[in-house]
Curated annotation (Swiss-Prot):
Biased composition (Polar residues): 148-165, 174-183
EC number of the protein: 2.1.1.-
GO MF, one example: methyltransferase activity
Record PTM Phosphoserine, positions in chain: S62, S64, S105, S172, S177
Superkingdom, taxonomy of origin: Eukaryota
The protein, known as: Ribosomal RNA-processing protein 8
Gene: Rrp8
Length: 457
């Protein structure tokens, strides 16, 4: 009775969910009549739209099913190959992580797995979320270097395997962002740990009261080192003493040269202006004489002790009054400056003694200056007739001993004893025979002695 519409014949195709082109339906769709027909037509169109969204459109023909099957196999093969590649990369990374860090606990590993699963990249490559997740994993490995990241790397690779595309897998350096920190080698990790320990020790807090007694007891057993301050002060004091000694030696040489190269009056003025200069000269003189095998004052004192103690002695150039301290005789001490209360300060060419008032006159290393004749004439004046003149002088000052002895005899003396055996000084004994036999204007070249100058060192 009624003609059946064309959509009844097309129903089996809908049940099979076969792809139907929109152009054919648009061309063959008849005008819809009735409420029931409109409902069926809407259902048909909804099913067609759902099938079109899930399946890619293919050309009509008998080869569409074969092409779909080939595409499905191809995609399955690509996914399986990508899974194998990602597993190999995961194993390599797992081995590296096992070398770099020890074991990690299960709870912490699960938390890191959840974090990495959340950051898994979508299809089509590595996204910003994957980079962020990998950065978190690397920061976790840096903060906990004693724990491994085996489970983290495995979960990240599994998520990549499930969502991988046809693109080849990228290396870790290419996939990581430039800001993310690189995985540390074993040597770098050790160096970083050492730097951390050094930084801790630098800012270590002060020791508690309980630790101080323990440390003190340990230090008591050890031998305390010598304080540096004392050694430095000792060295500084030794250096100052050495420099002072050198300066004193230089000044002594200068004063000695002045005494031998000028008259006694100039030397007296020099020491009156600078009394410390005489003290310095005397110290230098004593330092030089100490090196001699025999002091000439000791030899003269030995001779005087063999004579009567009643003899009056005049010591010209007494110094520190060593001769007066060595004999029992009364001694008149004369010098350019006073180092002892017994010393009378004066010029040896003019001593405050009466004529013919002494029995012995002594010149012990004191014939200094250019006016030696004045000294010997003054000794002749104060000596009693037959008095004794003793002269001890440095051996190197004599050029011709006979000439010197001849000149002394012209001044009213005669030689009674001479000792030339000592290597450092000569000793002569003269007896007064009378007043000088020559006038004051007569030249006595034999009385000129060489100055006793010390070498510069």
């Amino acid at each position: 009775m009624f003609e059946e519409p064309e959509w009844v014949e097309a129903a089996p195709a809908i049940v099979g969910l076969r792809p139907v082109t929109t152009q054919v339906q648009a061309a063959t769709a008849p005008p819809v009549k009735g409420r029931k027909r409109r409902h069926l037509l809407a259902t048909l169109r909804a099913l067609e739209a759902a099938s079109l969204s899930q399946q890619c459109p293919s050309l009509p023909g008998s080869d569409s099913e074969e092409e779909e099957e080939v595409g499905r196999k191809k995609r399955h093969f690509q996914r399986s190959s990508l899974a194998n590649v990602s597993k190999e990369v995961g194993k390599k990374r797992k081995g590296k992580c096992q070398k770099q860090a020890p074991f990690i606990s299960d709870s912490e590993g699960k938390e890191v797995e959840r974090t990495c699963h959340r950051q898994a990249p979508p299809l089509g490559g590595i996204s910003a979320g994957e980079e962020k997740g990998k950065r978190k994993c690397q920061e976790y490995s840096y903060l906990h270097p004693t724990q491994s990241l085996n489970s983290v790397d495995q979960t990240v690779h599994n998520s990549r395997t499930s969502t991988a595309t046809l693109d080849p897998p990228k290396s870790s350096r290419e996939s990581a962002s430039p800001n993310s920190s690189h995985t540390l080698s074993r040597k770098q990790w050790r160096n970083r740990q050492k730097n951390k320990r050094r930084h801790k020790n630098k800012f270590r807090p002060l020791e508690t009261q309980d630790q101080v007694p323990l440390k003190a007891s340990i230090e008591e057993t050890e031998v305390p080192p010598a304080p540096k301050s004392d050694s430095q002060e000792t060295r500084a004091g030794a250096l100052r003493a050495r420099m002072t000694q050198r300066l004193d030696g230089a000044r002594f040489r200068y004063l000695n040269e002045q005494l031998y190269s000028g008259p006694s009056s100039a030397a007296q003025c020099l020491f009156q202006e600078d009394p410390e200069a005489f003290l310095l000269y005397h110290r230098g003189f004593q330092r030089q004489v100490k090196k001699w095998p025999l002091h000439p004052v000791d030899r003269i004192a030995k001779d005087l002790r063999q004579k009567p103690a009643s003899l009056v002695v005049a010591d010209f150039g007494c110094g520190d009054c060593r001769l007066a301290s060595s004999v029992r005789n009364p001694v008149h001490c004369f010098d350019l400056a006073a180092l002892d209360p017994r010393v009378t300060v004066c010029d040896m060419a003019q001593v405050p003694l009466e004529d013919e008032s002494v029995d012995v006159a002594v010149f012990c290393l004191s014939l200094m200056g250019t006016n030696i004749r004045d000294f010997l004439e003054e000794a002749n004046r104060v000596l009693k007739p037959g008095g004794l003149l003793k002269v001890a002088e440095v051996s190197s000052r004599f050029e011709d001993i006979r000439t010197f002895l001849g000149a002394v005899t012209k001044l009213g003396f005669k030689v009674i004893y001479k000792d030339l055996t000592n290597s450092h000084f000569f000793l002569f004994d003269f007896e007064k025979t009378g007043p000088p036999r020559v006038g004051p204007k007569a030249q006595l070249s034999g009385l000129k002695l060489q100055p006793c100058l010390y070498k510069h060192r």
